[in-house]
Amino acid sequence: MSEAYKNAGVDIEAGYEAVKRMKTHVERTKRAGVMGALGGFGGMFDLSELPYKKPVLVSGTDGVGTKLKLAFLMDKHDTIGVDAVAMCVNDVLAQGAEPLFFLDYLAVGKADPVKIESIVKGVADGCEQSGSALVGGETAEMPGLYTEEEYDIAGFSVGVVEKDEIVTGNSIKEGHLLIGLSSSGIHSNGYSLVRKVLLEDAGLDLHQTYEPFKRPLGEELLEPTKIYVKPVLKQVKAGKVDGMAHVTGGGFIENLPRMLPEGLGVEIDNGSWPVPPIFSFIQEKGQLKAEEMFNVFNMGIGFVLAVKEDDLVDVIRELEQDGEKAFLIGRVQKGEGVTFGGGSLS
């Protein structure tokens, strides 16, 4: 042990203890293709063990943003890792790829082995939900950059798809229909606005329970991001999906056009799905316009599929059989951007 380093704020022994605690969680994410063990300089994966003829790797990286601030305030760290995984694997999924492996980066103000284990448990939970192996990562103790209670987490996902099965959105045409999959809540974006509206302006207490919720506000806000990989991949592999969008920062307005060919837009049937109460709660407390809400939040739809009309009924039925709540929320039309029909946004 380096006493000088410890006195400078870096506890090597605590770091070793954290790694030891991680191992059982990492172990349960192993899958076909994983090589080596935790602790090597690099994670290894053998693609030849998988039945892909012309594999294309698809990668994604992301973080959790200021949702972390709520985890600090609630001293609740066991689900924030799920968010880190979800933000990455849902992006990879949007290209039709099966997530293979994941790496995490955790920067902490102070190495607390119990807290780090709790965070990594969440990462492993997310990896299990998505079929990803947690093959490595980095935990950096950074005194002076973060307070002892603070940390940041980011992730990196790699997936694979057959070259001729990549979902690019290029085959989407006017008349394609949009299936929206329900979100679990706010997911992992818009939290700077959430904190300003609910905590700074309204002065609400994260530990209190407010109507219409049945648990403390902080727990409601920390509900982890839903991972859509397994049910959606079944539809992708069946050839029934022509485009996908992960509804994250920028909401419907920014994310739906990302899957569309040039010259096409979408019309969303406002009111065609139930909006979770957390969004109306935020809108009311902040006196926010509906346009603002749709420009920031997922509004209850976390992932969108573009399908042909002939496939609509089968895809919705099969998604619901797999436990998803799926809704016909709109259609592709000529033009640009996102328009709303079926109900006012005011």
UniProtKB/Swiss-Prot annotation:
GO CC terms: cytosol
The protein's Enzyme Commission number: 6.3.3.1
UniProt-listed PANTHER family: TRIFUNCTIONAL PURINE BIOSYNTHETIC PROTEIN ADENOSINE-3, TRIFUNCTIONAL PURINE BIOSYNTHETIC PROTEIN ADENOSINE-3-RELATED
TM region(s), chain numbering: none
InterPro entries associated with the record: PurM-like_C_dom, PurM-like_C_sf, PurM-like_N, PurM-like_N_sf, PurM_cligase
Catalytic activity reported: 2-formamido-N(1)-(5-O-phospho-beta-D-ribosyl)acetamidine + ATP = 5-amino-1-(5-phospho-beta-D-ribosyl)imidazole + ADP + phosphate + H(+)
SUPFAM superfamilies: PurM C-terminal domain-like (SSF56042), PurM N-terminal domain-like (SSF55326)
The keyword Cytoplasm appears for this protein: yes
Highest taxon of the lineage: Bacteria
Pathway: Purine metabolism; IMP biosynthesis via de novo pathway; 5-amino-1-(5-phospho-D-ribosyl)imidazole from N(2)-formyl-N(1)-(5-phospho-D-ribosyl)glycinamide: step 2/2
Compartment list: Cytoplasm
Name the UniProt record assigns to this protein: Phosphoribosylformylglycinamidine cyclo-ligase
Gene Ontology terms describing biological process: 'de novo' IMP biosynthetic process; adenine biosynthetic process
GO molecular function list: ATP binding; phosphoribosylamine-glycine ligase activity; phosphoribosylformylglycinamidine cyclo-ligase activity
Protein family according to the UniProt entry: Belongs to the AIR synthase family.
Keywords of the record: ATP-binding, Cytoplasm, Ligase, Nucleotide-binding, Purine biosynthesis
The protein's enzyme class: ligase
Organism: Bacillus pumilus (strain SAFR-032)
